[in-house]
């Protein structure tokens, strides 16, 4: 899931985007839990996951708007 490019996301179907978002949300939950317990080493991964979710949601919205 790490470092998804916009072109890679655009090539995904809506179902694949939903699965990617779900996976990233689970990863983000685990990262937050690790941060709270002091086990998180790569703190920047939290920010990356949040931004990847936003990137996928934005492209999904653009695709839906283009269909109309």
From Swiss-Prot:
GO cellular component terms given for this protein: cytosolic large ribosomal subunit
HAMAP family: Ribosomal_uL29 (MF_00374)
Gene symbol of the encoding locus: rpmC
Ribosomal protein keyword on record: yes
Recorded family membership: Belongs to the universal ribosomal protein uL29 family.
Keywords in alphabetical order: Ribonucleoprotein, Ribosomal protein
Protein's UniProt name: Large ribosomal subunit protein uL29
Organism, as annotated: Rhodopseudomonas palustris (strain BisA53)
PANTHER family: 60S RIBOSOMAL PROTEIN L35/50S RIBOSOMAL PROTEIN L29, LARGE RIBOSOMAL SUBUNIT PROTEIN UL29C
């Amino acid at each position: 899931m790490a470092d998804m490019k916009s072109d890679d996301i655009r090539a995904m179907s809506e179902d694949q985007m939903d699965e990617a978002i779900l996976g990233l949300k689970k990863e983000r939950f685990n990262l937050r839990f690790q941060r709270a317990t002091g086990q998180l080493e790569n703190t920047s991964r939290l920010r990356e996951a949040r931004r990847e979710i936003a990137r996928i949601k934005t492209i999904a919205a653009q695709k839906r708007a283009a269909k109309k």
